[in-house]
Amino acid sequence: MILVINSGSSSIKFKLFDTSKTIEPILDGLAERIGIDGFLKFEHNNQKYKFEDPLPDHEHAIQLILNKLLELKIISNIDEINGVGFRVVHGGEISHSSIITDEILSKIQDSVKLAPLHNPAAIIAIKAVKKLMPNTSMVACFDTAFHQTMPEVNYLYTVPYKWYEEFGVRKYGFHGISYEYIVNKSSEILNKKKENLNLIVCHLGNGASISCIKDGKSYDTSMGLTPLAGLMMGTRSGDIDVSICEYIAKQTNTDIFSITQTLNKQSGLLGLSQVSADMRDVLEQYDRNDKKAVVAVEKYVQIVADFIVKYANYLDNIDAVVFTAGIGENADVIRDLICKKVKLLNLQIDQDKNQAKYSDYKLISSEKSKIPVYAIRTNEEKMICLDTLNLIK
């Protein structure tokens, strides 16, 4: 069995996978409000469990998870868990998932300056598991690793080169675990070897990015040094003129940290629509012809379309355009609006297919479409499980 952990500052999402025959999750859970007034909940065999517990820290939360797995006889002993895979947001220039050694843990620590909101929580969880399960192999799967194949011309910024040499200022990109899963799944769907696969993948969730996949590898992506760059998102601005920060700081007598917080937490769909960070709520107002909601949706769609056209220019041929993540998988209206904006590629959507229910993936383009368009449900936890399994064998 493989335990997959995604640790946040006050929560731990986890899945337990049975890997004996196929790779299937047998338990899906969440430890929430760690350090506040915590509780643990999970689902196993269609039965839901919830346990109130103070959960003073991450170690206590992981101990409770393991205790409940034993109590409920989901596992008979801890050694049945062969490996633990962790989602780590930032790995700097680490290019692949890695067994967690002291050296790898040190590199994750070094990347805290690049992901101060995310990496510390992963480090705490890793140290807790190391203490509670000292004989179990641990693997770190990095959201940045997949994009380490980008050429220098795509990852360097047009700033003094010493900023890269001294401070690591470059494009890293994110959502890499999701992109890796989508590349593998697309290879299977299209019956084409990964190394021959050219895709444009739109990972549209509350956080959103696009990746240009050339010969099965990341060639360019929209997020940058941090997840703030690129597309307009739920609460993030995406790309803006950086001088806006200095201008607003002077106008409002506000420090740069507060401005960055606003760009991360109060911008994007929420900032422009003044309705919500949730695309479903914004689309409700869009249907009612609310002016700000209409502008927000049109802006969102336009930016995604612009990136698709930009990335199409990198590729000699495109095997598919793929939509994934919360909005990409579920918002048929957004998929349709984006494809209509990409006039150069002649993406033709079949409305019946686009609106049809599906479980895993579906083709949403019509026979007239120059390029096939798919909606594919991503599965980052399964990807982490597979990477963990491959590394600990």
UniProtKB/Swiss-Prot annotation:
One of its GO terms (cellular component) is cytoplasm. PROSITE patterns: ACETATE_KINASE_1, ACETATE_KINASE_2. Substrate binds at residue 87. The keyword Kinase applies. It is an enzyme of class 2 (transferase). The active site is at residue 143. Mg(2+). Can also accept Mn(2+). It catalyses: acetate + ATP = acetyl phosphate + ADP. Homodimer. This is Acetate kinase. It comes from Mycoplasma mycoides subsp. mycoides SC (strain CCUG 32753 / NCTC 10114 / PG1).
